[in-house]
Amino acid sequence: MKVKISLIIILSILFLQFGTDPVQKDLLNYINVELPKVAPLETEAVNAYSSVAGANYTTDEAMYKKIKEEALPKYSKFTSKLKAIKPATPELQSVHAEYVKAAQDQEEAFKFILDAIKKQDAKEIQTANVDLNAASTLINNWKADLLELCKKHNVVIE
């Protein structure tokens, strides 16, 4: 009888120590399977925009063309595919929703920049840049929240 109880206790401890964590499993799938499917689109879109913004700015026409023909279509495709990712656990669903919101805001900011350039409205361009920076901040917040969730569930990102 004592052997059975000892065995049950040992197995219980092992199960608790090595048991499956559904959030951990969900995070591993999200990071290793789902995000790599969409990340290249985001990178290509942001790189296209960066190639005509800031220190790389040359003309409104060049910026308009690059955003309209490359950055926005790729970012729209990215946002659509990002929304299609459906994490299994509420914890990751909440963090993923932050990313979707940030991506949608960034996509809208790209559209707003196009409209402002088309109208040649300096005030709208300034507002669009503020919106783009706000979306970037939301993406950084998502990254921090994702890292925190990973830490909480013993997922190491290399």
Give the residues covered by each predicted segment.
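Sec-dependent signal peptide cleavage junction
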Residues: 18-25
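N-terminal hydrophobic targeting signals that begin at the initiator methionine
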Residues: 1-2
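Sec-dependent N-terminal signal peptides
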Residues: 5-14
